[in-house]
Amino acid sequence: EARRVGWGASGRNGGQVILGFGCEQPKIAAMVGPELSRRMFDWSIEGVRLVRERIATHGIDAGWRDGHAHVAIKPRHIDELKAWQDDLATHYGYALPWWDREQLRAQLDSPRYLGALFDPASGHLHPLNYTLG
């Protein structure tokens, strides 16, 4: 933001507001231990909640849309996503529903996707509108 708030990345990112981090929780747990990994994951959930709350509290026209689907486009992705689903439920108390191909197709009419984990708490917004408030 070398010029003004919203000019750079904060106004141009993809607008995804999703839980977690850029790598999987087991990797984080291996680096910082299970207790801090759990706290960090909880912070990410709180971050998503705060964004949603601020949009509502301040009446920001950010075009919020509920939900985020982590999709599988290859058979191996199904196994990876289901392992992640199990890890989140077992170690973090966060249950994500699995959408098979038909359930996903009802939401996203594309034959490309094999299935998805759906997170109803995450979402998408218009990043510049959110930044400008």
Outline where the language-model segments fall.
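Glycine-rich FAD pyrophosphate-binding loop
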Residues: 1-12
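Surface-exposed, flexible loop/turn segments at secondary-structure boundaries
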Residues: 5, 25, 77
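Rossmann-like flavin
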Residues: 31-133
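Glycine-rich active-site loop/strand segments that organize a redox cofactor
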Residues: 12-43
